[in-house]
């Protein structure tokens, strides 16, 4: 919205108005969206948590077959803390992003839609006091429909460059120089799998205090930089990246994700006063997945978000192996609970997973030069 004001003033010949002139700089708007999102999330935190406690009563149900100490330590903790993140994310993005940018609206649309889906899941769990909310099939069908619509919108309406003809339906491979495969309209399915899959991967990771949100912020930082670089024709040319017109604006959204995440972590730090819930995890995973699709770095997301991928794979492997043999590979899935069963303290698991996520973000950035 503030960018609209700057745009209106600049068209009227008033582009040099102090302070507002700063809005033409993407880096400034990214920083301001981060700060704004943080302030919004922190400011609403205490009252929102008290309200959630009053409304939810017993709070988020804890798995009875899980880690024994969690049943005692985490009982009564409210969920739906994702609302705090999303409030900051949307306020920061709407204030400082260019709202004429189709990439911004696609990412915000995915984020909001998945947030609503997550809220419905959290609401069902809290009201029924069960760890089973919406069925997996219900969530997946909704996620795929939304993701398919988003992919179609990008293919049809996203700005195109004469030098990137066909890029909107192509998969760009990292490291392997100039290896690009045009999937045609099959790309819609690929994009939907990327968005929905990563959304669920983040959801599965959100099982310990602070575990998911910090890796989400690492990934958002990485993809904010990637979006900034591939959206700038000079930087893209220098780094031999495929230029994606106008996608740099997503750096502002990534800044808002980071700021909202920091504000939420203020209250989610151990011992957590509130859980993110599916309201936050499904939305943030969808946001990162859609940003990767917009920036044409879907495969790099598998590296940067490798921690989330590993968590999801551990569940898939556990379920498949158990169905076939009646035995379990891991003591408990997702894999962070496996390490708890091995005797690792919760804080040890969380911090070590943060380290892994940070290193994977660096590896993902390194692929920009390994071409």
Swiss-Prot record:
Record Pfam families: Glycos_transf_4
Catalyzed reactions per annotation: UDP-N-acetyl-alpha-D-muramoyl-L-alanyl-gamma-D-glutamyl-meso-2,6-diaminopimeloyl-D-alanyl-D-alanine + di-trans,octa-cis-undecaprenyl phosphate = di-trans,octa-cis-undecaprenyl diphospho-N-acetyl-alpha-D-muramoyl-L-alanyl-D-glutamyl-meso-2,6-diaminopimeloyl-D-alanyl-D-alanine + UMP
Membrane-spanning parts: 25-45, 79-99, 104-124, 139-159, 179-199, 210-230, 247-267, 274-294, 299-319, 348-368
Entry EC no(s): 2.7.8.13
Any one annotated GO CC term: plasma membrane
Subcellular location: Cell inner membrane
Membrane topology of this protein: Multi-pass membrane protein
CDD domains in UniProt: GT_MraY (cd06852)
Name of protein: Phospho-N-acetylmuramoyl-pentapeptide-transferase
Taxonomic path: Bacteria, Pseudomonadati, Pseudomonadota, Alphaproteobacteria, Caulobacterales
